[in-house]
Curated annotation (Swiss-Prot):
Family, as annotated: Belongs to the IER family.
Disulfide pairings: none
Chief location category: cytoplasm
Chain residue ranges for the region called Disordered: 54-156
InterPro entries referenced in this protein's UniProt entry, alphabetically: IER
Organism domain of life: Eukaryota
Induction notes from the record: Induced by basic fibroblast growth factor (bFGF).
Modification N-acetylmethionine occurs at: 1
Ranges of Basic and acidic residues composition bias in the record: 64-77
UniProt-recorded name of the protein: Immediate early response gene 2 protein
Chain intervals with Low complexity compositional bias: 125-136
Keywords recorded for this protein, A-Z: Acetylation, Cytoplasm, Nucleus
Length: 221
C-alpha cells in the first residue's frame, strides 16, 4: 500500500512539472533528470525502511517491561525526594518577621540626622567680620599693635634719611648750592664813578675770585 501511494505521488508531481516546464528552454530534459533523481531517492528510502523492519527482533511486551536497561530503578530518586522535605525548615510566621523589621528600623529613626555643611562661598568681608567677632579683645589689641608697628617700619624704610639724599659729601653739596645761588642772584655790579685820570678796573673781580674758589674745592674733592 505504501509503495502504491509513493508511486502515485511521483506520477502526479512529474505531470505537474511537465505541464509547467513545457514553455521553458530545456525544461523537459531538466524535468527528466529531476524525476529520475526523485524516483531513485524514494526507492532507496523504501528499501532501507523495509530492511530495518525485517532485521529488527521482536520482543514480547513482558520482557521489554522487565528489562533493567530500559527501565532503571528509581530508588535513589525516591530517597532524595523523601529526604528533602525533612531538610527544609518551616517558614517563620509573619508576626515575628514584622517584629524583626521594627527592631531594625528603630535605631535608624532614633539617630539624629547629620548636620548638613553649607557649601556656599562666603565673601571676604563676611570672613573678616566673623574672625574679628570671634577674637578676644586682648588678642585683637595685640593684632592692632603688630599692624601699627609693621606700617611704621614700612614708612621708615620708604623715607630715606637726609644724609643719603644729599650724597656722600653733604657739606660740599651745600657749599656748592649756596655759591651758585649767590652767583645767580647777584646782578651786574655797577662800577663806582672813577676819575677820568684813573684806569678802569674790571667790575666782576669778586665773581672771578669766587669761581676760582669753587673750582679749587671741586678739584680737591
Amino acid at each position: 500500500m505504501e509503495v502504491q501511494k509513493e508511486a502515485q505521488r511521483i506520477m502526479t508531481l512529474s505531470v505537474w512539472k511537465m505541464y509547467h516546464s513545457r514553455m521553458q528552454r530545456g525544461g523537459l530534459r531538466l524535468h527528466r533528470s529531476l524525476q529520475l533523481s526523485l524516483v531513485m531517492r524514494s526507492a532507496r528510502e523504501l528499501y532501507l525502511s523495509a530492511k530495518v523492519e525485517t532485521h529488527q527482533p521482536e520482543f514480547p511486551p513482558s520482557r521489554r517491561a522487565l528489562d533493567p536497561r530500559l527501565h532503571p530503578p528509581r530508588e535513589p530518586e525516591a530517597a532524595m525526594e523523601a529526604a528533602t522535605p525533612d531538610v527544609e525548615q518551616p517558614p517563620e510566621p509573619m508576626d515575628t518577621q514584622e517584629e524583626v523589621l521594627r527592631v531594625q528600623e528603630t535605631p535608624a529613626l532614633c539617630d539624629p540626622p547629620p548636620a548638613r555643611v553649607s557649601r556656599k562661598r562666603r565673601s571676604s568681608s563676611d570672613l573678616s567680620d566673623g574672625s574679628d567677632a570671634g577674637l578676644v579683645p586682648s588678642k585683637k589689641a595685640r593684632l592692632e599693635e603688630v599692624e601699627g608697628e609693621a606700617t611704621s617700619e614700612v614708612s621708615n624704610r620708604l623715607q630715606l634719611p637726609p644724609a643719603q639724599t644729599e650724597g656722600a659729601f653733604p657739606n660740599l653739596a651745600r657749599v656748592l648750592q649756596r655759591r651758585f645761588s649767590s652767583l645767580l642772584n647777584c646782578g651786574p655790579a655797577v662800577p663806582p664813578p672813577t676819575p677820568p685820570t684813573c684806569e678802569a678796573k674790571p667790575a666782576c673781580r669778586p665773581a672771578d675770585n669766587m669761581l676760582n674758589v669753587l673750582v679749587r674745592t671741586v678739584v680737591a674733592f
